[in-house]
Amino acid sequence: MLKHKLTLSLPFVLLSIALSPSVNALELNNVIIKSGARIDKKAMDKKLNPYLGKEIDIALLQNILNEISDYYRKNGYLAAQAFYPEQQSQNGVVEVIVKTAKLDDIKISNYASLTPKTAYMLTENVRKFQGKEINSHELNASLLKIKDLNIFDIAGYFENSQNKADHASLTIDLKGRSRFGYELSYDNYGNESTGKNRYTLSLNSLNLSKHADKGYIILGTTDKKQNNLILGYSIPFTSHPTIFGFQFNYGSYELGDTYDSLEVKGNSLGGNLYIKEPLYRTLDSRVNFTGGGYYKALTDKIESYSLELKRNKFGGYFDFEASVFKEDLNFLNTLKLDYGLVQDKSNLSDDKSQRAYLLSNFDSKLDWNFYKNYSLINTLSVQYAQKAVDASDKFIPGGAYGVSAYDGSLASSDLGMFHDLKLQTKLMSKPYLDFFVNFMQAHAQNVEVEKKESFYAIGSGSNISYGGFYLSASVSKAIGKNKEYAKDSAKFLLKAGYAKI
């Protein structure tokens, strides 16, 4: 992420250690390294151990310098250079000085239309390195945390300082992205009772108020009057950068199909406040923490019986995300702990009962490009609870996000596990086209029931995208003991849309 063309001025060194006749036969006993840069001393000693006990000569001394310089550079010290000060060694101990560039001035090129105050706040952690030895790993960690806001692009590059020798000036470019974006999509991921065909419009704005903030609106509907509205907003308020955000959602439904005569309908209203903190970041890894609280008011009506069921749900949650990014491998993991309190406010009785439970969810995805255009993608989702959970928190083993050969309304449970193993090959790059085959399984169980139900399926599909347009199609077939509960002999799923980000 950081680029440089730094050079250091080094003093002329007299290699009197190796050239003096009195020490030609000396063996190397120890290497003393002096530097203001911080490294793992044990790891450095391990690198130099193979040279100990060998006869000191020009080749050995040069190899040691190369080894030390290379180690410092790999550990983030740009343009680090090891050299020997003038010295005489009579006991096989040599001294090495490692010179590294220090950070002088920092220039912010604000092409992202941020307010000066916001640009200054976000780069505060970078400015803390001024006057210190430049370590690209530490600087990259700070810059990547800013980049992870996904509001603008950021890049940095070093040049030799015009003010101080062996110092570097850092320029940070903040480049704005398209300020407004949208996405239109269609899919048949719904179910028969609430609408199989779903239509979604998403609108988003980046850097909405020029404070690196983000806002979005999501509107969704189905062919059977299920409607959803989601409003969200987030803004960084510290230099970490810690993010504060909120989300408001409203949904309504009317059950059709076999429920027409009962006139079943309902709605939900809710909100969520959260804080997101980046705990750790490198070029190939990331750890984030999110904590928040939420409120939901849910109402279900059966109008043919004049029956109304109401309940409120309050809760708090913690979410840990740990990700690893390599050239041929991405590994994403999320653990969420949710404490919920449900209050029953239905008009069936005067009883205002309430119940509380702790719910944990773990999601993992491994994407391994093991050979040329072939990838193995392993997806795992696990839900665990010690008590029966609210209907809104149930694990869904079927549907488009589970074992897709089964309808999403077939079953739900308190506990569950979903696993999808997919072999995928990329056929084209422009337009992008892939093909995959996969095996899916899900296991579901309720807290108060000992019996576990299992669902299995095999499938295949393809994804294509070009210039903002995308299309995903798949077909799956149920296998195993519960295959007779699959509504169709083969389930076809389709999603298509256009996104302008």
Predicted regions and their residues:
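Outer-membrane beta-barrel "beta-signal"
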Residues: 203, 462-470, 487-501
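Repeated loop/turn-to-beta-strand initiation elements of outer-membrane beta-barrel proteins
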Residues: 154, 180-182, 208-215, 239-245, ...
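Outer-membrane beta-barrel initiation region
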Residues: 70, 76-82, 104-245, 281
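Transmembrane beta-strands of outer-membrane beta-barrel proteins
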Residues: 182-184, 213-217, 242-246, 287-291, ...
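Hydrophobic, lipid-facing positions within transmembrane beta-strands of outer-membrane proteins
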Residues: 168, 197-201, 227-231, 269-273, ...
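C-terminal outer-membrane beta-barrel translocator/porin domains of Gram-negative envelope proteins
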Residues: 299-302, 306-439, 443-445
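Transmembrane beta-strands of outer-membrane beta-barrel pores
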Residues: 188-190, 207, 219-223, 248-254, ...
